A protein has these predicted regions:
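N-terminal pre-domain segments of enzymes
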Residues: 1-33
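Active-site HxH/HxHxD metal-binding segment of metal-dependent hydrolases
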Residues: 2, 80-126
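Short linear motifs in intrinsically disordered/low-complexity regions
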Residues: 6, 42-43, 112
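Compositionally biased, intrinsically disordered low-complexity regions
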Residues: 12, 17-20, 42, 104-105, ...
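Short, flexible coil/linker segments at or flanking structured domains
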Residues: 24-27, 31-34, 45, 54, ...
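Conserved structured core elements
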Residues: 26-27, 37, 76, 98
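Conserved beta-strand hairpin/beta-sheet module of binuclear metal-dependent hydrolase folds
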Residues: 33-84
Length: 126
């Protein structure tokens, strides 16, 4: 049975990248166009880069990344966007929850001494 056959007829549509989704999901995704927003002094949030948003805060010692996304490619794309605003070195990342950690290696490649912060139970989920 194909993926298409597992859905009730008429309940899915094919999206612009060939993905199958409910029509309301495809409509909602149009609102999530990839864009870096300045959300405060030295603070940015990238929306539409993947499942999670990646946020960045520039502190006195460098850039803190909040959530690293689903993959290294996603985090690399996020860094490329924020580098248009700041060249501060990446000094830390914060995990808000476990499935937003997939792009951490991209940050470690920039800083072998990267500080990583998350809640006490996050290690069990990695």
């Amino acid at each position: 049975m194909s993926v298409e056959d597992s859905f009730k007829p008429g309940t899915t549509q094919t999206g612009p990248k060939g993905q199958l989704a409910h029509p309301k999901t495809l409509e909602h995704s149009k609102r999530l166009k990839k864009k870096l927003y300045k959300v405060g002094d030295n603070a940015w949030s990238l929306i539409g880069n993947g499942l999670s948003n990646q946020s960045f805060v520039e502190g006195p010692e460098g850039l803190i990344c909040i959530d690293t996304g689903e993959s290294n490619q996603e985090m690399a794309a996020a860094l490329k966007e924020v580098r248009k605003e700041t060249q501060a070195p990446v000094v830390a990342c914060i995990y808000t929850h476990f499935h937003y950690v997939g792009g951490t290696q991209t940050l470690v490649d920039e800083n072998k001494n990267l500080a990583i912060w998350g809640h006490n139970g996050i290690q069990a989920n990695l």
